[in-house]
Amino acid sequence: KIKSGWERLTSESEYACPAIDKFCEDHCAAKKAVGKCDDFKCNCIKL
């Protein structure tokens, strides 16, 4: 049960911005993009 909550949190990584940039980076890395926090949203920038 904890795992599903954690996956939900990491999949909604913008909620971690700007507190935890790593969530945003990891979330975007899975999409082969670079994650940057923009206020409270996580933006994935394609390379």
From Swiss-Prot:
**GO CC term (a single one):** other organism cell membrane
Q: Which cysteines are joined by disulfide bonds?
A: 17-37, 24-42, 28-44
UniProt keyword terms in alphabetical order: Disulfide bond, Ion channel impairing toxin, Membrane, Neurotoxin, Potassium channel impairing toxin, Secreted, Target cell membrane, Target membrane, Toxin
MF terms (GO), sorted A to Z: potassium channel regulator activity; toxin activity
Give the UniProt tissue specificity note. Answer: Expressed by the venom gland.
Pfam families attached here?
A: Scorpion_toxin_alpha-beta
Q: Which cell locations does it reside in?
A: Secreted; Target cell membrane
- BetaSPN-type CS-alpha/beta domain location is 14-47
Q: Which PROSITE patterns match?
A: BSPN_CSAB
The protein's job, in short, is: Blocks voltage-gated potassium channels. Its application (10 uM) to cells recombinantly expressing channels results in membrane damage and cell lysis.
**Other remarks?**
Negative results: has no effect on voltage-gated potassium channel Kv7.1/KCNQ1 and Shaker channels (tested at 10 uM).
For domains, the record's comment is: Contains 2 domains: a N-terminal domain that is unstructured or forms an alpha-helix in presence of membranes and a CS-alpha/beta C-terminal domain, which consists of an alpha-helix disulfide-linked to antiparallel beta-sheets.
The Swiss-Prot or TrEMBL record describes its family as follows:
Belongs to the long chain scorpion toxin family. Class 2 subfamily.
- This chain belongs to the protein called Potassium channel toxin TcoKIK
